[in-house]
């Protein structure tokens, strides 16, 4: 059966010149524990990151975003913070942080920290004092005495379920009350209805801004507020009827524990703190927000008519919806959905991987690694890359006895692999030496991937063509005017050929062709775009494509092999040479 997909097309106006540093920025997520170990303990650290900053500069990055580095008992690998103003000792200390910050400035890189405001560790002094009903801290968290249950017992005040399964309420014997935890029981939720909490968390931001950071990525934003208490009780959430497992968070529709109206005002208040600093030296501090929620809710993070919010509310349309068998038409749908929803005066961003998802090649297809990196670097505005995706790192199977991810460890040996995020967090593969050049330790915190001897930075940097070489060429090329300012016209031909054109009048245009299918397809550009020139110059293509860079090709008859991409250019009035 032949499937016909109608031609999709839409056009966006060109962007203005004089861009701020972040508006067309390339951001790189470093998972510090896995990036580079400088002291031989098998765990990555800040001095290791500092050692590799030159590499990040060389591959075209503008911003370096660090996953959490603050003091933590590591119940959730840094997302359970016991002191917001200290560095986790495994990663270094404040002096190591200062070395990192200074080196970033020297190289022209912007340092972004992970800010985890929804909760703390249960080992934080805030929580310990709250348990003791210290006058200052007694209402720093969400407490409730419980309601009467059978046989004169106390039961939780609502049916809320945590992200990590089971009740969101945990009984504290010392205080004789329940406390709320939307994540692990070791991660009690802060009470943002308390003005003292709001001010204290603003002061945490100021502390790190004073130390020179360029912004923050805000974790788990939709969970900041819950619906307020009414008549001594919290409102129950309705059943979703999508699962019969009452411990599963999907058992409920989270109408009371996510996306509350007060959340957006809190984001706007934090943006105001960042702007205080930006005004003092005319250097923009940025906010990224993480929220796995509906697209309209994500768009609200941008701000409104009276208040600015996050410059970069993470766009999860692709990461949440595109699968290994997705077509070009599918991909275009999710790209268009974001572009249609985004306010005209805001910047797009594209996120294809992170520490909570399987690696790009494992999730979407190893053959398509370059295809997706081509898309990431040529779609409008901001790109975010998870460490190792530039070389095509893949998930590494981790046996049960070496699994450390709390999400997996709370299951069992039969089912843990469905929950574990460890496979996408293995050490960075720098070279073919011991532990892939990550560490000199006898044992690393997670096993190094089995393929490190053939898949690493050193090998790819020396190859004639490789994922890394393609990535570096893309990041260099995307700084050109057509990709920083150009409008975009997207079309889908058949089911699997996605083609988009970026153009600047009187300068030229770039055409990006992505073949999501397994079969070769002729581009046929003259049938897709008006005034398409017959011949265009190859800028860069997937590793699977044999056509050399810089050659000119017939854009109607050129055949693009399956699961690959190519970038073509035509500069008006010039015979372009691509460096």
Swiss-Prot record:
This is Salivary alpha-glucosidase. Its main location: secreted. InterPro entries: Glyco_hydro_13_cat_dom, Glycoside_hydrolase_SF, O16G_dom_2. One of its GO terms (biological process) is carbohydrate metabolic process. One of its GO terms (molecular function) is alpha-1,4-glucosidase activity. It catalyses: Hydrolysis of terminal, non-reducing (1->4)-linked alpha-D-glucose residues with release of alpha-D-glucose. Residues 1-18 form the signal peptide. Saliva (at protein level). Proximal lateral lobes of the salivary gland (at protein level). Its EC number is 3.2.1.20. PANTHER family: ALPHA-AMYLASE FAMILY MEMBER (PTHR10357), MALTASE A1 (PTHR10357:SF233). Belongs to the glycosyl hydrolase 13 family. GO terms for cellular component: extracellular region. The active site is at 219 (nucleophile), 290 (proton donor). It is found in: Secreted. Functions as a glucosidase that shows high activity toward sucrose, a major component of nectar. Assists the mosquito in its sugar-feeding capabilities. The keyword Transmembrane does not apply. CDD domains: AmyAc_maltase. N-acetyl-beta-D-glucosamine binds at residue 325. The keyword Secreted applies. Keywords: Allergen, Calcium, Glycoprotein, Glycosidase, Hydrolase, Secreted, Signal. The record marks 356 as: Transition state stabilizer. Ca(2+) 2 binds at residues 118, 189, 223-224, 226. Ca(2+) 1 binds at residues 37, 39, 41, 43, 45. Glycans are attached at residues 118, 151, 282, 304, 325, 401.
